[in-house]
């Protein structure tokens, strides 16, 4: 295994960064986070038609580019750096991975080409009002047989759930947790955008009342699919987190060079030096964890479950600590609404809690390695 990125992967990073610098500057982030939908449809269309980003790891047979999870991780790292406001994570990471892991060729052929082109926005709705990612907490009922069902219940904290054109929903049948595809505008579905701390990542409450749904995969095998998907999801999130962590480290170091106090740059003071050095150590360690997770995901090897939990736990804390220290190094200006430091701090906190916080993943890691 080679930890160095290939020339092609570095070129991908360069291209994506240039695109995001142009399309997702701080002004665009602030503009989109104030809107209900939370993203610019024109930029989304360019991401699909010009860049092909939505199909980055989707197999070519389903209209994608057929790259590996490493390339997806490179893209997500750059998106984390720029705080991109778009339904990319929900569509490409949550929904596409669920379809790919479902084993349902018909569903893949039906939905993946639209996702790869950017025509379809999608998401995964699994968490219920308890807020826990847990099989035992899934109580939504599915009634029906064959491939046609109706769903009733509530899903919470659904990423981009208020705008997704297709929603994958977990629900209980007589055979156990199963997965279903629901049209975003289906009759009986009520979608409510939630007010969240992190305005750059939209979430929604979805209420189902006898909503028509189509079975995805094998009835009763939904949690097996979701368990595999969660490992892939947290690895992807770790990649996004290290992008944000590197950005706040860069912000802190740059400010320490130009902010003068007592006749000298504050970066020359030992206390600031130590803060920056500690941030660097954590960020570089987080990158190692995230990159190894990306490689494990691309290989789908037996290490993936353990490495996924390890990377999510470590990268969550590294990003949150770096974002908090960035505010401290900036001093008073770092606490203001006008400065971008708080945007990264809020993203760091929301990402820390998504799909299991560090405590959850440490416990899961302990179980997975047999402690």
Specify the residue positions occupied by each region the protein language model found:
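Alpha-helical interface subdomain recognition
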Residues: 1-83, 102-107, 114-119, 144-149, ...
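Short glycine/proline-enriched turns and hinge-like loops at secondary-structure junctions
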Residues: 67-68, 134-136, 160-164
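N-terminal glycine-rich flavin-associated loop
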Residues: 86-106
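Short beta-strand-to-turn element immediately C-terminal to the catalytic PLP-Schiff-base lysine
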Residues: 100-103, 143, 169-172, 181-184, ...
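A short, Trp-centered hydrophobic/proline-enriched beta-strand micro-motif
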Residues: 118-129
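Cytochrome P450 C-terminal beta-domain/meander region
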Residues: 134-152
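Flexible, small-/acidic-enriched active-site or ligand-binding loops
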Residues: 137-139, 157-158, 183-215
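A short core secondary-structure module
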Residues: 152-189
């Amino acid at each position: 295994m080679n930890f160095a990125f290939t020339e092609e992967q570095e070129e991908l990073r360069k291209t994506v960064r240039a695109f995001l610098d142009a399309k997702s500057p701080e002004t665009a982030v602030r503009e989109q986070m104030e809107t209900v939908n939370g993203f610019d449809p024109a930029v989304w269309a360019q991401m699909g038609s010009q860049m092909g980003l939505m199909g980055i790891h989707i197999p070519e047979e389903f209209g994608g580019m057929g790259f590996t999870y490493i390339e997806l991780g490179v893209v997500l790292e750059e998106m984390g750096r720029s705080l991109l406001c778009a339904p990319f994570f929900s569509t490409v990471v949550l929904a596409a991975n669920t379809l790919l892991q479902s084993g349902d060729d018909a569903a893949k052929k039906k939905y993946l080409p639209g996702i790869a082109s950017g025509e379809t926005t999608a998401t995964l709705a699994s968490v219920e009002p308890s807020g826990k990612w847990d099989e035992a907490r899934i109580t939504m009922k599915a009634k029906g047989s064959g491939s046609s069902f109706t769903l009733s219940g509530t899903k919470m904290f659904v990423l981009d759930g208020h705008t997704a054109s297709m929603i994958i929903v977990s629900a209980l049948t007589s055979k156990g947790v199963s997965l279903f595809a629901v049209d975003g505008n289906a009759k009986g579905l009520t979608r409510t955008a939630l007010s969240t701390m992190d305005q750059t990542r939209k979430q929604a409450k979805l209420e189902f009342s006898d909503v028509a749904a189509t079975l995805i995969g094998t009835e009763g095998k939904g949690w097996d699919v979701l368990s595999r998907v969660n490992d892939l999801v947290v690895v992807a999130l770790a990649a996004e987190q290290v992008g944000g962590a590197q950005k706040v480290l860069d912000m802190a170091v740059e400010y320490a060079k130009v902010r003068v106090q007592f006749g000298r740059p504050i970066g020359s003071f030992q206390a600031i030096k130590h803060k920056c050095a500690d941030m660097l150590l954590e960020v570089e360690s987080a990158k190692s964890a995230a990159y190894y997770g990306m490689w494990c995901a691309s290989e789908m090897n037996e290490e993936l479950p353990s490495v996924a939990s390890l990377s999510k736990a470590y990268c969550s804390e590294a990003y949150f600590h770096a974002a908090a220290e960035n505010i401290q190094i900036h001093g008073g200006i770092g606490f203001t609404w006008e400065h971008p430091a708080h945007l990264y701090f809020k993203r760091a906190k929301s990402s820390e809690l998504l799909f299991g916080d560090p405590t959850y993943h440490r416990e899961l890691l302990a179980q997975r390695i047999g402690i």
